[in-house]
Design a protein with these regions (language model features):
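Conserved helicase RecA-like core
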Residues: 1-159
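Basic Arg/Gly/Lys-rich low-complexity intrinsically disordered segments
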Residues: 70, 140-196
Length: 196
């Protein structure tokens, strides 16, 4: 596992994929939008990638999976739901770009590599807000996940505690309400001014 900051996850992923031994990887993202964002980032780095998720048609998902199996793309980015039922032989690497909030999903994800007695490597990229998920996963699997020490993008942000999260959400909601109130005032003002 690599502990990093949320804003350095892409850089860390690019660093990990510089390792030429990682010829193909199934990468898990938490959301459909996140999966698409990761694919865009990888393509900017000239890494062939495709996403499979619920917003993709069945044909698009099958095409991406076939391209992955045919080694035409290096990284297949999937959400947990879209990955169910797919079978990929000789998959050596799985990357958890987003740590799942359900421990069982982690077990399901890492079970995708190293099947049929083959070795497999699971790599997880953990942001501060995901630290608690790692603790839950370690409780479920009854072992500590090895931490990569040679990490060029170490985690420096500490996760918010419960009180800080509440205050953050309260402030975010206050700012949102203020924004909409100002926008509505501006609209009303411009409509009055436009009627003269």
């Amino acid at each position: 596992i690599y502990y990093t900051n949320h804003n350095t996850k892409n850089q860390l992923l690019n660093y990990i994929l510089e390792d030429n031994r990682i010829d193909q990887v199934l990468l898990f993202a938490r959301t459909k939008h996140g999966a698409d964002r990761i694919v865009r980032n990888l393509k900017k780095q000239r890494i062939e990638a495709a996403a499979i998720h619920g917003d993709k048609s069945q044909n698009a998902r099958q095409r991406a999976l076939q391209q992955f199996k045919d080694y035409k793309i290096r990284v297949l980015v999937a959400t947990d739901i879209a990955s169910r039922g797919i079978d990929i032989d000789n998959l050596e690497y799985v990357i958890n770009y987003d740590i799942p909030n359900e421990s069982e999903s982690y077990v399901h994800r890492i079970g995708r590599c190293g099947r049929a007695g083959d070795d497999g490597i699971s790599i997880s990229i953990c942001g501060p807000e995901e630290n608690e998920y790692i603790r839950d996963i370690e409780k479920l699997i009854k072992q500590k996940i090895e931490v990569v020490k040679d990490n060029p993008f170490p985690q420096t942000d500490r996760p918010m505690n419960a009180r800080e999260k509440r205050e953050f959400e309260k402030e975010k909601n206050r700012r949102r309400q203020e924004f909409f109130a100002n926008r509505n005032r501006n609209r009303a003002s411009s409509q009055r001014g436009g009627n003269r």
